[in-house]
């Protein structure tokens, strides 16, 4: 988790570290599990990315067979490939997470250190004979053969960051949107639609605050632990797709702000760590991606990067138009912040 201090508030980035926690908890605060048999949002996936200080998770939305929209703070500074899965449940607990979530995508997942892999985050488990248990293997293309034991299937991709992303330094030019260009197309999953330009501006403010916006992600839930200190804290597991409906509070030129308190009588909760980059849906469109919250225990106001504004939408359209030719072609045509 990265925290950016402001003069008036602490803006907490909603990316989630893949830490080893033993307490079972859900994802989106106050939300509900997506149905694993007949999912409501099968085009929302978990995005696992790698940086010099560790391995983290975000969420994202398939908007093209080879393009996942996520947050720029999830893609900026990534090392090597990104891993994406659209499985409804990824890991029920920390032990499973250590086995089924890829380590670094430039190794085979058996313990060799690679780019973005922080050795301090990993626990080596031993079998009855004292031999190290391997992490879940996958081949060099990045696809895991998850069909045999129900483990998640992963696909690799390359992260691109909006070229005008301000890294939380300019609220008027926030542009917290990134994408993952997948190495192979996803089939059998309906893609989400981008909104018309200025879609949210077309809803009067008085009407907008009466609407419900669906948010989806693979993040943590803030709750009391089953044992030990009872102060509400973010819980990392299980990692699974959850959803909720939030009430908008205000709209700016860049941000849709919503109330993420699950006790709001008009809404159902909000997003938390690991939900970053996940979608905000309205009217059949993805209108935003999860950007930040104001507190370290979530359950308060959240900011969602608008994707209907020209500066973001035009970049996404360019990426979609070039994604079929691969990440290098999309980068050359549309740009990406290094």
PLM segments and residue spans:
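Short loop/turn motifs at secondary-structure junctions and domain boundaries
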Residues: 50-53, 263-264, 269-272
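Chymotrypsin/trypsin-fold serine protease catalytic domain
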Residues: 173-268, 302, 309-316
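C-terminal subregion of chymotrypsin/trypsin-like serine protease catalytic domains
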Residues: 40-41, 57, 62-76, 82-92, ...
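Secretory targeting and sorting signals
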Residues: 1-27
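C-terminal region of N-terminal signal peptides and the immediate post-cleavage residues
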Residues: 19-36, 81, 327-338
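Conserved catalytic-core segment of clan PA serine endopeptidases
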Residues: 29-40, 50-52, 82-188, 198-200
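Short amphipathic beta-strand segments in non-cytosolic proteins
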Residues: 46-48
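Short, solvent-exposed aromatic-acidic interface loops
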Residues: 75, 163-165, 260-265, 291-295
């Amino acid at each position: 988790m990265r925290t950016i201090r402001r003069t008036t508030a602490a803006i907490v980035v909603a990316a989630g570290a893949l830490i080893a926690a033993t307490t079972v908890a859900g994802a989106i605060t106050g939300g509900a599990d997506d149905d694993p048999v007949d999912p409501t949002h099968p085009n929302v996936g978990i995005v696992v990315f790698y940086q010099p200080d560790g391995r983290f998770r975000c969420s994202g939305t398939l908007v093209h067979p080879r393009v996942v929209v996520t947050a720029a703070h999830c893609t900026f500074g990534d090392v090597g490939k990104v891993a994406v899965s659209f499985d409804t449940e990824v890991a029920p607990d920390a032990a499973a997470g250590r086995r089924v979530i890829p380590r670094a995508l430039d190794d085979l997942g058996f313990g060799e250190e690679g780019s973005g892999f922080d050795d301090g985050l990993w626990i080596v488990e031993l079998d009855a004979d004292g031999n190290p248990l391997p992490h879940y293997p996958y081949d060099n293309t990045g696809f895991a053969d998850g069909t045999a034991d129900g483990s998640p299937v992963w696909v690799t991709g390359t992260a691109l960051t909006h070229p005008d992303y301000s890294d939380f330094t300019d609220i008027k030019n926030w542009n917290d949107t990134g994408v993952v260009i997948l190495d192979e197309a996803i089939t059998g999953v309906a893609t989400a639609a981008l909104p018309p330009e200025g879609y949210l501006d077309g809803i009067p403010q008085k009407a907008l605050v009466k609407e419900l916006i669906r948010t989806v992600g693979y993040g943590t839930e803030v709750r009391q632990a089953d044992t030990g200190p009872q102060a509400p804290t973010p819980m990392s597991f299980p990692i699974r797709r959850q959803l909720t409906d939030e009430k908008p509070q205000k709209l700016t030129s860049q941000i849709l702000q919503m109330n993420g308190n699950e006790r709001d009588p008009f809404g159902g909760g909000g997003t938390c760590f690991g939900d970053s980059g996940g979608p905000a849906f309205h009217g059949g469109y993805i209108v935003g991606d999860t950007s930040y919250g104001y507190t370290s225990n979530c359950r308060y106001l959240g900011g969602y990067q608008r994707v209907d504004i020209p500066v973001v939408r035009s970049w996404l359209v360019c990426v979609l138009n070039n994604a079929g030719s691969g990440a290098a072609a999309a980068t050359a045509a549309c740009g990406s912040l290094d």
